[in-house]
């Protein structure tokens, strides 16, 4: 699923202006600029590629291992009741920044009236099953 869209020369994820919460050989983690919950964090590969599907196997593995570390940090800091993890890939998938990234989103009891379905809610009529 290689995307042809190119970020402007100053990619906001290639040169993040936020505190790095955690890092690994192939990835960085920092707070989302527009968090949907307290602690919402992005795991971003160091190499500029459009989507997580464009990552080399070692980069992909490293990103998800860093996401696990981030989950542990967020659990200790925020004591959430659950998590969502995911990546928006392609325009139809909701991607708005054309540098691959993984969202790690702490979830709290009561933050939405009907949490069942989780990420399935991206298509509301398909959330219930």
PLM features: residue spans?
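HIT superfamily nucleotide-processing domains
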Residues: 1-129
């Amino acid at each position: 699923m290689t995307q042809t869209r190119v970020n402007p020369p100053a990619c906001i994820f290639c040169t993040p202006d936020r505190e790095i919460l955690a890092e690994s050989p192939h990835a960085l983690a920092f707070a989302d600029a527009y968090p949907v919950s307290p602690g919402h964090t992005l795991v971003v590969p160091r190499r500029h590629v459009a989507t997580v599907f464009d990552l080399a196997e070692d980069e992909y593995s490293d990103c998800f291992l860093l996401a696990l570390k981030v989950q542990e940090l967020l659990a200790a800091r925020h004591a959430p009741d659950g998590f969502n993890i995911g990546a928006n890939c392609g325009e139809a998938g909701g991607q708005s920044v054309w540098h691959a990234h993984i969202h790690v989103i702490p979830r709290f009891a009561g933050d939405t009236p009907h949490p069942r379905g989780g990420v399935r809610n991206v298509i509301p009529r398909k959330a219930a099953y």
